[in-house]
């Protein structure tokens, strides 16, 4: 007779490889169920393959003919600018493909320091620090800066990277209603017991195209002794008279404490993000921000492209000035046709449709007519608020914009979105 429970172990013994296969089969079943649920809800996100450079005119795999691109963050059209490309090639030749290191070991080159200094000058701040992306900048900031003694007050529609970054910190968390200054004031009053109070907001909200009321936010922050943080990914390079962003547009550059933004949209479109603000804060981030400490340095070619993009922007504001008229042309024509366009005076122009399947099907039919746009639905936007987000670029022509509107009208009528 076998001792103890050995006989039970023998009875239920399964070879290790078979147990692993069983676990994998279980995982596959769970994942397939999740994926089928996404498809069934009409929120499946497919990835179109572009076979050309980024720009207003592109080629898409499986689609014949040229395509007009109205869904890129390439606001200034600099991603394919010849001087930007040449600067990237020059940096690649001079500094190599990459650093194979994090910044504090052997991953800092002169071009990294030069770009950080240039970013600080551009935003009129004391210092700046580069990250692989603005998602990383947001992930690194709050945890390094805020302690359990502090509080962060966040707009409910802030970008996912801000929300995720705030989740990582140990500060007390308050969420105020979108753009609701009365609610923000109530939350600031409630947060008076904490050491530091940081108001966190997008400058321009990426899904709605609306702009934070920075003057009111800064006024409340001053009244209640709070700091102001702003994510400028959808503003840097093209909002404000010289493209400095939302704080320049609204005349509060000296009142916003911290700015996070990206090199991956208007400033060349490659990748990279940054924080700019007080010198001691940037120094602390170099010591404490985990995405900075544990991620490889930005590749030299990316740094070279972004640096040249900033040079072009600081040298002339002609490109910036062309944005407003083109944005207004699209918005006014679409609204005259009967569409509802969210936001105001921003090149992000969300065509509000409500139904996820409708947004997806209309986007597919737009592509058949040579217009590349994307339908956005839950969880990227709230349920019942699906939309097609159109983004205007400085390099779109008036003819491009008119062609896009004509296609929307045709497809809208086809799907019953217009009478």
UniProtKB/Swiss-Prot annotation:
Residues 1-21 form a transit peptide. Belongs to the class-II pyridoxal-phosphate-dependent aminotransferase family. It comes from the Eukaryota. Its main location: mitochondrion. This is 2-amino-3-ketobutyrate coenzyme A ligase, mitochondrial. It comes from Homo sapiens (Human). Strongly expressed in heart, brain, liver and pancreas. Also found in lung. PROSITE patterns: AA_TRANSFER_CLASS_2. Gene3D superfamilies: Aspartate Aminotransferase, domain 1, Type I PLP-dependent aspartate aminotransferase-like (Major domain). The modification N6-(pyridoxal phosphate)lysine is found at residue 265. Pyridoxal 5'-phosphate binds at residues 134-135, 206, 262-265, 295-296. The gene is GCAT. Its EC number is 2.3.1.29. It is found in: Mitochondrion; Nucleus. Disulfide bonds: none annotated. GO terms for molecular function: glycine C-acetyltransferase activity; pyridoxal phosphate binding.
